[in-house]
Amino acid sequence: MNLLAFDTSTEVMSIGVSRVVDGVPRQWLHTSAGGAQASASLIATVMDLLQQAGLTLAQLDAICFGAGPGAFTGLRTACAVAQGLAFGADVPVLPVDTLLALAEEARHAALPEVPLCRVTALLDARMDEMYAATYDFADGQWSEVQGSHLVRPEDLVVARGAQAVQVLAGNVFTVYADRLASAEQNATTRITALPTAAALLRLAPGLLAAGKAVTAAEALPLYIRDKVAKTTAERMAEKAAAHAAAAQ
């Protein structure tokens, strides 16, 4: 399966391409500063990784992006680029919850041999709040226990499951250290992690098989807080993606 994935929902921009070469799965990955810088370099880096992998946009089975929740500008940039590239190449789009990608990254990095676990994924949402969601991992599959929502650190409730391993994962443990003490009492471990393109690439085959892909026109960011206006950078990223797809 030929896949392109990227996430710009946090302060880190993560991009990846995967394909099978001579029967062996291979990945090309890139990580750099995200935030406001993502719109300036995302498309160029995507095209460079595709070239390294020997793929064109039209040869992709899907374009995956971190749909949210996360930083507004990053979410809109990722969605606009995914739409622009997919429109020109007639490729389906796979929006993936960034908190699910975070949970998968934490599990894969720190608990690869653990067959059963419950992960509460947490991203700093600023304004004294966190984005949170809880997932169970069993039999190689993820299932949602509690969907993405906003919560104050001291109000976070970690629901205990039957799993022996209960994980808190995310980027909130320094900024909200004292205020997470109650939640951490119900966790067996905590893992500092962010959503990554590698996690998106691992999740994509199962999500595609489950029919989660959409057309470019149907792709949307997942907001927990409301925001309406597009920034100039977001509009420029959308146009640049369309031009890049048309040039191939």
Give the label of every model feature segment.
Residues L4, G16-S18, Y131-Y135, L222:
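Conserved hydrophobic/aromatic positions in well-ordered beta-strands
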Residues V21-D22, Q37, P92-P195, V228-A229:
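Surface "functional belts" at beta-alpha junctions
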Residues Q51-Q59, A86-V96, E113-V114:
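Phosphate-handling active-site elements
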Residues A33-S41, F72, R76, A80, ...:
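Residues at secondary-structure transition points
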Residues C64-P92, T98:
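DPxDG-like acidic metal-binding loop motif
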Residues M1-A67:
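N-terminal beta-alpha supersecondary unit
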